[in-house]
């Protein structure tokens, strides 16, 4: 699961995992 610190502001996707939110 993506780490909260890795989330783009707005919760769109995680740059490291690429998982959509």
Swiss-Prot record:
Keywords: Hydrolase, Protease, Secreted, Serine protease, Zymogen. This is Trypsin. Residues 8-21 form the Peptidase S1 domain. Its main location: secreted. The keyword Methyltransferase does not apply. Its EC number is 3.4.21.4. Residues 1-7 form a propeptide. One of its GO terms (biological process) is proteolysis. GO terms for cellular component: extracellular region. Belongs to the peptidase S1 family. It catalyses: Preferential cleavage: Arg-|-Xaa, Lys-|-Xaa. The keyword Secreted applies. It comes from Protopterus aethiopicus. One of its GO terms (molecular function) is serine-type endopeptidase activity. It is found in: Secreted, Extracellular space.
